[in-house]
């Protein structure tokens, strides 16, 4: 069935959940919203969409109606990928940003972190619509009922959401629409305080009545575009009307007898696959679990992966190389040879052969499994909220490069480099592909790093999903310094430092090391045997099922 060691050697506040139908999210009310759909006879996609809508209400610090989404759906026989990330307004280019924001010390146009010049077309609502049209079984309006109810009646804010909410207020409180929506008492809500989001509820009711396309055409789209126009933003009704999500073929990489699947670029999921390939060639799982030798090899593999991803990944229409070239096994084997087992190294990018959220998972007793992620990017996104509508607009445009030589250079109608990545695991048995696990780890640059670390723990070391969730994590920063959770063994940290890693021990895991949700199928041939689900204690969520 699994071959897991069900012992959990790490401190935890969660237990794995065994059930025939499961939903695992970062907020209990969102998990309950998903379960309500399954109780009504809906499928895993219905459950995932209900949970996704609910979590825009109860965790607005991470996602909202103005964000983006990606999904991987196992329909019982085939894995489908959806890219619902938005594109730049048609007016954007490097000169646009240079005129409005000047140049930096390197002569490149400056790009802001918040405000209108970070707002790309929101893709999440169109993503919900696409998923429902292809796989949903309940009426779309039914899926929004729990979210509407929570937004109108209110909910008590849990500790981690309250912490992130308070941290965002000093930077965002003066931006248009933010305080009216998210500071009804003139401040961030405290733990346990009741919050209602009436504007958000009205928008959800409009989507339930008129369909998700109403977000992109008609009165609601006009309202969004007018807000942009009044604020000096470039987003127009034409930008909204032209947007469509894309069904795409997932990419995959073999690892220890399984295939790990990710969404292809413009997302960074390929970083996890590159790192897994390099780590396997380097023999990371041949050392004891949690040993400094294993951790060092995984860290170096991740650094090599990021070096390539930051150089090559962009909107696929602008990339110089293909994902297949970046994942070429011979190329990854050569990259693995660059790792010094005794020393940390700062790597440059290679030359492949020619040729950043909330995450949730749902699965049902009929065998359908969903790996879904949505995000506003940095906290509340741009900080801009459409007045009276509760639509917090993302700041995903900050992910573009201003370097004209980069494949990720900003351009109208183009998708930026994206951090959010759902994942999935399958295996081949007797010529048939079988579903194994839907999973994801939210949290900016931590996402592919979380994928690497948890997959190595489960598939390389046989740790059960909850243990893989609870284990201490490390995070490679963009300057190649290393953050580690304070729960990591001191001997391991000292041994990594002796290898030359510049290490910062972090006592606040909630903000830095991501949060995962995992659903593992117990019997690949019989979905009625059910699943085991795990939810990360670094957020307020849980796994639930029946």
What are the roles of these predicted feature ranges?
Residues 1-32, 36, 44-210, 215-217, ...:
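Noncatalytic scaffold domains of N-terminal-nucleophile
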Residues 57-74, 78-83, 234-236, 368-433, ...:
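Active-site rim segments in enzyme catalytic domains, especially the processed small/beta chain
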Residues 247, 354-357, 418-420:
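Short, small/polar residue-rich loop motifs at catalytic or cofactor-binding pockets
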Residues 261-269, 357-361, 371-384, 440-447:
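Glycine-rich phosphate/pyrophosphate-binding beta-alpha loops
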Residues 269-285, 425, 434-436, 443-469:
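M16/insulysin-pitrilysin zinc metalloprotease superfamily fold
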Residues 281-376, 389, 396, 507:
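Internal maturation/activation junctions in enzymes
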Residues 318, 414, 451, 460-510:
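Extended C-terminal subregions enriched in glycine
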